Swiss-Prot record:
Protein species of origin: Jannaschia sp. (strain CCS1)
Its biological purpose: Required for the formation of a threonylcarbamoyl group on adenosine at position 37 (t(6)A37) in tRNAs that read codons beginning with adenine. Is involved in the transfer of the threonylcarbamoyl moiety of threonylcarbamoyl-AMP (TC-AMP) to the N6 group of A37, together with TsaE and TsaB. TsaD likely plays a direct catalytic role in this reaction.
CDD domains: ASKHA_NBD_TsaD_bac
InterPro entries, sorted: ATPase_NBD, Gcp-like_dom, KAE1/TsaD, Peptidase_M22_CS, TsaD
Gene3D superfamilies: 3.30.420.40
Top-level class of the enzyme under EC nomenclature: transferase
Recorded coiled-coil stretches: none
Lineage, top ranks: Bacteria, Pseudomonadati, Pseudomonadota, Alphaproteobacteria, Rhodobacterales
Protein name, entry field: tRNA N6-adenosine threonylcarbamoyltransferase
GO terms classed as biological process: tRNA threonylcarbamoyladenosine modification
Annotated cofactor note: Binds 1 Fe(2+) ion per subunit.
Length: 359
């Protein structure tokens, strides 16, 4: 008779951008319970600057990490001594924030005598559909976030094959830029989505980059430029933008992003050898995008709950749990990494990693 999988309790820590997070997760990898997930947002700290300021973010992480860990422990109803291992985002991201998290995790691991597991932040997002929907490997993932956009064949807890990605800006960075151009608050993704609800997505014709080229690569830099020119043309012609102008621009932009990602997803799916299709990352919270992607295939489709799309520590704890079950642990030489590709064998993307707060 086969023994039941061991139940483990993992503390996860996340601090790669502008959210400080801690979570407690328990179970074997195929039967997980999230006991707590605490996220402290820095949105108000960065609002006046129109984007994330790395120095402010790093300082806020250092001041907040202890508090979110304490709250996660209290919510889960456990003590630090009950934790079996500590998983922490070790990259990629803003180096000051990543370093704050890694140092905090090292201190806890050393003081408690617990194993330490460094987690690739992108792996946390990539494995979220398995956490929430139990997808079987291999599945196709569209990882779409503030600093990244790539198609990955997820073959195992630490095995990822990149099929394509953005050659310049990530969609999340493009949403933020469009929001700034239109005077909408940050973060730009939710602001653009809200404004688009009252907009006409057919009013303005915007380019759909790289659809004339084969493959799964994407580009969003030219789309941002097109929105800038559209805005400037309306301002010059009418002396300013009306609320309807803003709504229509947002709706048109959002529709183009969704249609481009949907078409590129069809191409990635045509490569075959996957059991399901999933989307993850912060931009995956966009409902128009989710609806467009769900229509591209008859395979099972997974889009995690909104709270697990944006940055959080539960997905880091889960990735750490799977790595720990696979026998990987790190020691006190674990370093913070500003860049950390999931598919280390793939050639670097043109322009990859140069734009966005989390690049």
């Amino acid at each position: 008779m086969r023994a039941a999988p061991m139940s483990l309790t993992i503390l996860g820590i996340e601090s790669s951008c502008d959210d400080t997070a801690a979570a407690i997760l328990r179970g074997p990898g195929d039967d997980v319970a999230i006991l707590s997930s605490v996220v402290s947002s820095q949105t108000d700290l960065h609002a006046a600057f129109g984007g994330v300021v790395p120095e402010i973010a790093a300082r806020a992480h250092a001041e907040t990490l202890d508090l979110v860990v304490e709250e996660a422990m209290a919510t889960a109803g456990i003590a630090l001594s009950d934790v079996d291992a500590i998983a922490v985002t070790a990259g990629p991201g803003l180096i000051g924030g990543v370093l704050s998290g890694v140092m905090a995790a090292k201190g806890l691991a050393l003081g408690l005598g617990k194993p330490l597991i460094g987690v690739n932040h992108l792996a946390g997002h990539a494995l979220t559909p398995r956490l929430t929907d139990g997808l079987a490997f291999p599945y196709l993932l569209l990882l779409v976030s503030g600093g990244h956009c790539q198609f990955l064949r997820v073959e195992g807890p630490e095995r990822f094959v990149r099929l394509g990605g953005t050659i310049d800006d990530a969609p999340g960075e493009a949403f933020d830029k469009v929001a700034r151009l239109l005077g909408l608050p940050q973060p730009g993704g939710p602001s653009v989505e809200r404004a688009a609800l009252a907009g006409d997505a057919t009013r303005f014709k915007l380019p759909r980059p790289l659809l004339d080229r084969p493959g799964c690569d994407l580009s969003f830099s030219g789309l941002k430029t097109a929105v800038l020119r559209l805005r400037d043309g309306l301002v010059e012609a009418n002396g300013g933008l009306t609320e309807q102008d803003r709504a229509d621009i947002c709706a048109s932009f959002q529709a183009v992003v969704a249609s481009v990602l949907a078409e590129k997803s069809r191409r990635a799916l045509a490569l075959g050898d996957v059991t399901a299709f999933a989307v993850a990352g912060g931009v995956a919270a966009n409902q128009v995008l989710r609806a467009a992607l769900e229509e591209v295939t008859d395979l099972p489709f997974a889009a995690p709950p909104l709270a697990l799309c944006t940055d959080n520590a539960a997905i880091i704890a889960y990735a750490g749990l799977l790595a720990f079950e696979g026998g990987r642990v790190d020691d006190m030489t674990l370093s913070a990494r500003p860049r950390w590709p999931l598919d280390a064998t793939a050639a670097p993307m043109i322009g990859s990693g140069k734009k966005g707060a989390k690049a």
